[in-house]
């Protein structure tokens, strides 16, 4: 299973697909993150912002039904996508990990550098793969995202993983 979007592409993902298919006769199944998490109409609605004099913080607002629905749907779709998979590859991509998922505030100028849908889809894929004992290969930005999901110890991260 390869997390990939044909419209966006990516040289790393393409080279992996070619190598595995030709040299190792491996069947590659592509998990398009847009099929796992449909485009979120208003991504900011998922987050609750709190400001005080010392620190501004942000967290995912799990009290609204839309948030729970998106995370639940992502997990169910990830289960289906990984149903007959022996491994999961998370390649790098041009987008940065959306820091809002980990309790950080991002600049309005940086919003376009993040892909919330892809981040949620890959979180769901990683969560399901680890539950099922499916090996995961992270490449470049994929390993960074994998480390954030599996190793980060913040309360926000733990809360997200519980809901996944």
Curated annotation (Swiss-Prot):
Q: Which UniProt keywords apply?
A: Glutamine amidotransferase, Transferase
Q: Which cysteines are joined by disulfide bonds?
A: none
Question: What Pfam families does this protein map onto?
Answer: Peptidase_C26
Domain named Glutamine amidotransferase type-1: which ranges? Answer: 39-164
As recorded in UniProt, coiled-coil segments are: none
Q: Which GO terms describe its molecular function?
A: hydrolase activity; transferase activity
| PROSITE patterns reported in the protein's UniProt record | GATASE_TYPE_1
Protein name (Swiss-Prot/TrEMBL): Putative glutamine amidotransferase-like protein RP713
């Amino acid at each position: 299973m390869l997390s990939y979007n044909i419209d966006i592409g990516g040289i790393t993902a393409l080279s992996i697909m070619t190598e595995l298919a030709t040299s190792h006769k491996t069947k590659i199944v592509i998990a398009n993150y847009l099929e796992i998490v449909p485009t979120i109409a208003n991504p900011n609605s998922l987050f609750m912002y709190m400001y005080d004099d010392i620190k501004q913080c942000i967290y995912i607002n799990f009290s609204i039904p839309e948030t729970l629905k998106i995370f639940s749907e992502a997990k169910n779709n990830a289960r289906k996508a990984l149903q007959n998979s022996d491994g999961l590859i998370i390649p790098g991509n041009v987008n940065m990990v959306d820091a809002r998922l980990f309790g950080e505030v991002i600049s309005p100028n940086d919003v376009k550098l993040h892909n919330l849908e892809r981040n949620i889809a890959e979180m769901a894929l990683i969560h399901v793969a680890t539950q099922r004992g499916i090996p995961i290969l992270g490449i470049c930005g994929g390993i960074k995202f994998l480390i954030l999901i599996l190793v980060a110890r913040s309360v926000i991260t733990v809360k997200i993983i519980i809901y996944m």
